[in-house]
């Protein structure tokens, strides 16, 4: 609606989604999903946290630096959506996934050996979409409603 309205007024808006449901991993998903927010977070949160962690030498390992920056970045994304538990848990969930994927990419010989094979891309897409859908479920707030219903019994 906003894109159409702005186009009618002659204002060009940036593309905000680029076929995110074709993503074969979570990094790919976040470069395609909500592009303006993802880019802003990458430039102003992830990069700055990463540089600060490297400069202050909080961790001796570059991989730990990146995983920490992913956690902070995705938590910031959760807080950006709101202060409800579901949004914060959603950000934390994606932070854990992004950090875990970073470790998997860097450390897994299986990944390095198979990442370009078609069967692996299909499997990776399937796993990624399931993880994203779990994230959407968390984002919806439904898990907390279900938990409250169970606790009231």
Task: Report each predicted region and the residues it spans.
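Membrane-embedded transmembrane alpha-helical bundles that form the catalytic cores
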Residues: 1-153
């Amino acid at each position: 609606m906003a894109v159409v309205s702005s186009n009618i007024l002659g204002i060009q808006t940036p593309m905000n989604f680029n076929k995110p449901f074709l993503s074969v991993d979570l990094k790919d998903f976040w470069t395609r999903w909500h592009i303006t927010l993802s880019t802003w977070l990458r430039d102003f949160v992830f990069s700055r946290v990463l540089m600060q962690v490297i400069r202050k030498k909080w961790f001796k390992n570059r991989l730990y630096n990146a995983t920490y920056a992913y956690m902070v970045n995705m938590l910031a994304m959760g807080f950006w959506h709101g202060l409800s538990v579901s949004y914060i848990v959603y950000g934390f969930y994606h932070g854990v996934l992004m950090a875990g994927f970073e470790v998997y990419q860097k450390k897994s010989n299986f990944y390095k050996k198979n990442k370009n094979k078609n069967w692996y891309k299909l499997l990776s897409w399937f796993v990624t979409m399931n993880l994203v859908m779990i994230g959407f479920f968390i984002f919806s707030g439904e898990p907390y409603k279900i938990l409250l219903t169970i606790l009231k019994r």
